[in-house]
C-alpha cells in the first residue's frame, strides 16, 4: 500500500498533531465529537516535507491522492468543482503542529470563476454575496499564491468607495463588486502577464503549494525562531467546504476565548463581525462587536455557541481559542486550540480549573510555563505620576504591565528605531500578522 498523505476529518483525531497539524487534528476531534464542522480533508505535514524535498513541487502521487479526496468531498457534499448548478467552494488553510496564529496563509472561496460566479449568484438569489465572494477570492489568490501585494487591490476598493460616496465595503452593491472583480482580474493580468486561472483544480493546487511555501515566509520564520519551533516540522493543509459569513445580515464570523486571555476571568472573551468573512475580524478592516453582543443579534446561535464552548473546554481541560462562522443563522465551528494567555491569566486559569475539578494540582503546575513567570514581575507606572499624567488615548489592555517609548506608526519604523537603541511604542489602528517583528521590538503596542 502506498503512503497515505491525505485524511478526511472523520479519519483523524486530536492525537494526530504531528501528522495533521494542530488545526487539522482539532477539526478531526470536533468532527468526532459531533460538532457542526464543515466537511473537509487534511493534507499532512509529511506532504509538506516531501514538497521541499522535491524542490518546491507537489509530486504526481500526492497530487493524485489530493484529487481522489476532492472527489470524496464532492460525494459527501453533493457539490462539484466548477459545476454551474451546485458548485463546490472550499477554503485552504495552513495548520502547523505548533500554534502559529496568523503567521501563515489562508485562501477562501476557491472554486469560483467567471462562469461559476454567475450560476452562484442565481442559485443563492444573492448576486451581491456572489460577487463579494469572487472579488475576495481573486484578491486572496493574487496575494497569497501569486504574491501580488494586497495594496494594489485595496487601492481599487478605496477608489470604488470614493466613486460611490460610501465609507464601508458593505455599502457597495452587487454591480460595484462585479466591477471590482473585473478590475481585480485586470490588475492580476497587468502584474503577471496572464489571465486569472479559471480551472478550480489548478486554483486548488496553486493554493496548496502557496500554503506549503508560507511555512518559509519571513514572518513564519521569525515566529518559529522566537518560539523555538523546528524548521523541519512543515505545515499541514486543511481543505474545507466553505460556509459563508458574508451572505447578509443573518451571517457573520468571529473569534473567541472560553476565558479572558489577559486576566483569566471565567467569561467568554472575543469579537465578531456581521456580514463578513474570516480574515475580516482579525485584519482590522472593520471594527468588530464584542462576543456578548451576539446574544442580542442572534440569541439562538449564541446559545449554541456557549454550549459548544463549555463542551470544548471540558473535553480539552483547558481554555480554548475558537473561530466560528454563522451562515444564515446556522453556526459552524472552524477551529479550536488551547489559547495563548498572559502569565497572570495562566495562574488564575490553572487554579480555577483545579477548583472546578477539571484538572489535578499536579496538572495545574505543569500548565504554567516557567519562562512566563518573570512577566508577573512586569513594570508598572508610578501611581503618583499617573495622577499627574494627561491622557491622550485609551484602549483595552491585552497584557499586563506598563511601557514607555517614542510613538511610531509602522512596524518597520519600530524595528529600525529599536535596532538603533530607541525605545518605541507602536501605535496602529489595528494590528495584523505583518506587524509581528515591529510588535516584538516595541516596548508596547497601542491600537486606537
Regions found by a protein language model. Give the residues of each.
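Long, structured protein-protein interaction/assembly regions in large complexes
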Residues: 401-415, 422, 429
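Long, terminal "pre-/pro-" and other extracytoplasmic accessory regions
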Residues: 218, 235, 391, 399-405, ...
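Nucleotide/phosphate-binding sheet-loop regions of phosphoryl- and nucleotidyl-transfer enzymes
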Residues: 1-389, 416, 422-425, 430-437, ...
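Membrane-bilayer interface helices and TM-boundary transition segments
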Residues: 444-448
